[in-house]
C-alpha cells in the first residue's frame, strides 16, 4: 500500500494510520456473525471510553456523517410537545438549530460570538424564564474556530433545572477525557472519523438507557430513528436495520485497538495538546496569531488570523499542498482566518515540517 499523498491537518476526515487503511482491503457481509460480533465489540468499547458506569449507557451506531447522528438524536429524543435550548457559537450549533426548525421542534437559542465560549449566566437566565424547555444541547468543541465550550457547567445547569442534556462531542470524544455519567450527559454524539482516527461513514450516539427507552415511537424519520436502530442492534446481536458501512466499521475497530495501544484517551489528548502548543508557538515565531483565547482553545484545531500585509490564503493552501499538507479555510464571517488541525496520525515532527513549509511560502508585511 502506498503512503499518504497528503498529510491532512483538518478536524476530520483526518490522516489515518496505514494499518487502519489496510483492514479496508477485505470485504464483509452485513449478515455475517463475525462482522456483527465486531459491531457489538465496537459498541461496548465506546461505552467503556465514555464512562466507568457502563451499565447505565448504551451505544447506537448510525450510517452517514456525524450530522446524521445529530439529526437522529434531535428528531428522536425530543417529543412533539418538547422544547430545545441550543447553545451556539459556531456553525455546528447553528446546524442543530436548523435541524430543529426543519423538524418543527420548538427551539430557543443562547448565542455568543464565535470566539467566545457559551455564556453560562445567559443560559441560566433562559432556563429560569422559559419553563417549557425540556432539552438542552451544546457543542463541546466548536471546530468553526477550535473553541471549547463549558459542557460541565452547561450539563450541571441542565440537570439543576431538570432538562435532558445533549452534547455534540463530534470533534472531542476520544481526544479529550469525558465521563458522561459524572457530567450527567444523556446523549453524546460523535463520529468515526474524528479523534478515534477512523474513516468517514458512520456516527454514533452514547445514550443513557432510561432516556433512550423514552424515545420509542417519537422519531420524525424512518432511517434516522434512533430507538429502532438501537433496538435492532440489541435484539439481533449487532445487526443494523439497513446496509452498514462494513469497511468503515472494520477500520474503526482497528482504530479503537490503536487508541488502546497508544495508552487511551489521556495519552492521545497529551499528543494532541503538545501538537497544538507547538503549532501556536512556531506559528507565532513567523507572525501568525491565534483567534481564540488560550484558556478556551481546544487541542483539536486552531484558527489563525490573517496577518497584515499581502497575504492570500489560496496561495498558502496551494503552496502547502505542494509540500504535502492540506489545511482548512476559515469559517467565520467577522474575522479573516484559516484553520490548522492537529488530530489524526500527526506528530510533533509533522508540525515542525508544516511550519517550516509555511515559512518558506509566505511573506508577511
From Swiss-Prot:
Positions of transmembrane segments: none
EC number(s) per entry: 2.6.1.37
Catalysed reactions, as listed in the record: (2-aminoethyl)phosphonate + pyruvate = phosphonoacetaldehyde + L-alanine
Keywords attached to this entry: Aminotransferase, Pyridoxal phosphate, Pyruvate, Transferase
InterPro entries assigned to the protein according to its UniProt record, in alphabetical order: Aminotrans_V_dom, NH2EtPonate_pyrv_transaminase, PyrdxlP-dep_Trfase, PyrdxlP-dep_Trfase_major, PyrdxlP-dep_Trfase_small, SP_NH2Trfase/AEP_transaminase
SUPFAM superfamilies reported in the protein's UniProt record: PLP-dependent transferases (SSF53383)
Signal peptide: none
GO molecular function: 2-aminoethylphosphonate-pyruvate transaminase activity
Pfam families in the record: Aminotran_5 (PF00266)
Modified residues (N6-(pyridoxal phosphate)lysine): 194
GO-annotated biological processes: organic phosphonate catabolic process
Cofactor dependency: pyridoxal 5'-phosphate
Superkingdom of source: Bacteria
Subunit structure of this chain's protein: Homodimer.
Family the UniProt entry places it in: Belongs to the class-V pyridoxal-phosphate-dependent aminotransferase family. PhnW subfamily.
Function: Involved in phosphonate degradation.
Protein name: 2-aminoethylphosphonate--pyruvate transaminase
Species of origin: Bacillus thuringiensis (strain Al Hakam)
Lineage start: Bacteria, Bacillati, Bacillota, Bacilli, Bacillales
Gene this chain is encoded by: phnW
